[in-house]
Structure formats: C-alpha cells, structure tokens
Amino acid sequence: FDDLMLLLCCRQGPVCFIPLNEWPCSRM
C-alpha cells in the first residue's frame, strides 16, 4: 500500500478505507 494508492483513495472522502485499516486523509 503506497502513497499513490492512499492519495487516490483519499480523493473519495475524508477517510480512506482499505482492508483491515482506516487511513485518515489528514495524514496526507
């Protein structure tokens, strides 16, 4: 799971949902 995937996921909303994890987009 890399920065590009996180960036693309964070475009969808304030929280990025991936298997077994949640990434708040404020980390970007």
From Swiss-Prot:
It comes from the Eukaryota. Keywords: Disulfide bond, Neurotoxin, Secreted, Toxin. One of its GO terms (cellular component) is extracellular region. It is found in: Secreted. Contains 2 disulfide bonds. Its main location: secreted. GO terms for molecular function: toxin activity. Expressed by the venom duct. Signal peptide: none annotated. The cysteine framework is I (CC-C-C). Alpha5/8 pattern. This is Conotoxin Cl1.2.
